[in-house]
UniProtKB/Swiss-Prot annotation:
This is Tyrosine--tRNA ligase. InterPro entries: aa-tRNA-synth_Ic, Rossmann-like_a/b/a_fold, Tyr-tRNA-ligase, Tyr-tRNA-ligase_4, Tyr-tRNA-ligase_arc/euk-type, Tyr-tRNA_synthase. ATP binds at residue 222. GO terms for biological process: tyrosyl-tRNA aminoacylation. Catalyzes the attachment of tyrosine to tRNA(Tyr) in a two-step reaction: tyrosine is first activated by ATP to form Tyr-AMP and then transferred to the acceptor end of tRNA(Tyr). Pfam families: tRNA-synt_1b (PF00579).
Length: 332
């Protein structure tokens, strides 16, 4: 598989594809993903992303920014920086266990020790507006009302853009919820006459509980353990959560169990996937094949749930095993 195909694989959006294709053949491509350490991660963070990035780590330099300062601003783990750092070690261990062994793991607190970082921060801030920063607050799951009570939240989008510039990356990875920050970085880069970062946006996984309305997306969140599969969950936990999950028949959109099959298992399991169907065994060799079979009713929700729980337990096992013996009571 060519590099550009690996980048496009299992992505919701690439901004822009033309910019991405111009990077092909470049020998020293640098990329990053920023993750807030905030406790025990769920599968969208610590299974999907490390496996995605592991596929390109031989071709591209990958940096995982353990965004401890960002998590502190966002009041993750009550803003306790020591506890956030412990959460960052959990991220590093799980990412490496899931295959991302060649990445550089960098702390935001190391970046901010540099006066050059803060010079870039000020240069970046001078090329943005308060209105644009407010529009970017959803990247941290916040809004203007939250920021009015805590001014530090206004710094967050500018810090994220500064991270991109300071690390001098060609490519930024993240969920669709990071789009505002990446677009802000591209706009400010144009004003600075510097390279625009290629923004690669992955899918967000829906809450296992489903969404009340199709236009009201609720993502999987570790703050609600019953909405998410955590990397510490054992087989019985995974089975219980998947069996209780929203999974309407013949509907893949807004179906969290179908999303796990489409965005984690089929792209990254790496083995043949066979599932019981109404007309016999179905080989799920592509997302398109799964979509068609499920929407036609050839795969029943109960069979899908059984297959997803079984394979997901296997895929979570490396991350789960990497945390054995650690005291995780502070994150329960």
């Amino acid at each position: 598989m060519h590099l550009i195909e690996k980048i496009y694989k299992n992505t919701r959006e690439v901004v822009t594809r033309e910019d991405a294709e111009r990077l092909e053949g470049k020998s020293d491509i640098k990329s990053y993903i920023g993750i807030e350490p905030s406790g025990i991660p769920h599968i969208a963070t610590a299974v999907m992303w490390p496996r995605k990035l592991a596929e390109i780590q031989d071709d591209i330099k990958v940096t995982v920014l353990l965004a401890d300062w960002h998590a502190m601003i966002n009041n993750k783990l009550h803003g306790d920086l020591d506890l956030i750092r412990k959460g960052g070690e959990i991220l590093r261990k799980t990412f490496q266990a899931e295959g991302l062994t060649k990445a550089d793991y960098v702390w935001a607190s190391d970046l901010v020790d540099s006066s050059e970082y803060w010079r870039m921060f000020i240069d970046t801030a001078k090329r943005s507006t308060l209105k644009r920063v407010i529009r970017s607050l959803p990247i941290m799951g916040r809004n203007e009302t939250d920021a009015e009570k805590d001014f530090s939240m206004y710094l967050y989008p500018i810090m994220q853009v500064t991270d991109i510039f300071y690390l001098d990356v060609d490519m930024a990875f993240g969920g669709m919820d990071q789009r505002h920050a990446h677009m802000l970085a591209r706009d400010i880069a144009e004003k600075m006459k510097r390279k625009k970062v290629v923004s690669v946006h992955g899918f967000l996984l829906s809450s296992l509980k489903g969404n009340a309305r199709m236009d009201n997306f609720v993502k999987m969140s570790k703050s609600d353990p019953n909405s998410a599969i955590l990397v510490t969950d054992h087989m019985e936990d995974i089975e219980r959560k998947i069996n209780a999950a929203y999974c309407p028949p013949q509907q893949v959109e807004g179906n969290p169990v179908a999303e796990i099959m489409k965005y984690i298992i089929i792209p990254y399991y790496g083995k043949s996937i066979e599932i019981h169907g109404s007309n016999g065994v179905i080989n799920l060799d592509s997302v398109e094949n799964f979509d068609q079979a499920y929407q036609r009713g050839e795969i029943q929700p109960a069979d899908l749930k059984h297959k997803v729980a079984t394979i997901l337990n296997e895929m979570v096992e490396p991350a789960r095993r990497s945390l054995e013996g650690l005291d995780l009571s502070e994150f329960q």
